[in-house]
């Protein structure tokens, strides 16, 4: 009982930074519950995460009630041709930038007519690709009914680590916004 008491006290102290203590409280399920209970929908535009965010969320039963769809626009050409990102924007700021990820979030939200959207762009490595940003640099953008915003992170130089941490951080940012 002492362990349970200490656990409850600790969880109360760190509730803003800790999710998923119980099996039923995965961050994906918490997001799904918030979307469902508020009758909200979501869509994703994923670049270097390659659909991992979408895959994780649709693993929750009932996803069809809140998940409108996603697009994996890995290449610069795909971002321009399929998601409608302006080449001028990419030329001015780089494909890995705040401006591009926010445009991705807005465009996918419009494409799927969702209430919320989330987008990712970044350099997972091992090379920089079409960007001048350092390997490990990622941008995560969120569009809500009222605004769009983004965050920049650097998750190191391991490709698996960069994509994994980006998926987790995406869910964390989304949960806080909902």
Segment roles from a protein language model:
Residues 2-178:
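Short alpha-helical segments enriched in small residues
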